Curated annotation (Swiss-Prot):
The keyword DNA-binding applies. PROSITE patterns: ANTENNAPEDIA (PS00032), HOMEOBOX_1 (PS00027), HOMEOBOX_2 (PS50071). A motif (Antp-type hexapeptide) lies at residues 40-45. This is Homeobox protein Hox-C6. SUPFAM superfamilies: Homeodomain-like. It comes from Ovis aries (Sheep). Signal peptide: none annotated. One of its GO terms (cellular component) is nucleus. Sequence-specific transcription factor which is part of a developmental regulatory system that provides cells with specific positional identities on the anterior-posterior axis. Residues 137-153 have a biased composition (Basic and acidic residues).
């Protein structure tokens, strides 16, 4: 199962590897003199790259792009539970071919999006006084959910 996940997902340097594959294919078909005439301008070079020993090829990972299926499954899970237990996070990660860390961060981001959306709707419908009351209520709700999560584990 895990090997299928590895084969189906693309690495974090996908764009770089595609560009390298493309340039290697071009190199096979193009004559050597044409290859030497290609100029590399400063804007084509990687920014903040370190050539020293001990640095990885790319220190910062690119943005994770989730498939429609992965997004749908994550949204369904979020609809039922805004907080995951570690066991459930592992199950979802294996099912969707993602890491636990990716699942955790997706849920953190989704909770922030949900919070912003709920604050926006409450301020539009309730007026100015409702925002302070909502923020207090949100803290109590968060505490209750945290206690429920502890009981699940």
């Amino acid at each position: 199962m895990l090997s299928n996940c590895r084969q189906n997902t693309l690495g974090h340097n996908t764009q770089t590897s595609i560009a390298q594959d493309f340039s290697s294919e071009q190199g096979r078909t193009a004559p050597q003199d044409q290859k030497a005439s290609i100029q590399i301008y400063p804007w084509m070079q990687r920014m903040n790259s370190h050539s020293g020993v001990g640095y990885g090829a790319d220190r910062r990972r690119g943005r994770q792009i989730y498939s429609r299926y992965q997004t749908l499954e994550l949204e369904k899970e979020f609809h039922f539970n805004r907080y995951l237990t570690r066991r459930r996070r592992i199950e979802i990660a294996n099912a969707l071919c993602l890491t636990e860390r990716q699942i955790k961060i997706w849920f953190q981001n989704r909770r922030m999006k949900w919070k912003k959306e709920s604050n926006l709707t409450s301020t539009l419908s309730g007026g100015g006084g409702g925002a302070a009351a909502d923020s207090l209520g949100g803290k109590e709700e968060k505490r209750e959910e945290t206690e429920e999560e502890k009981q699940k584990e």
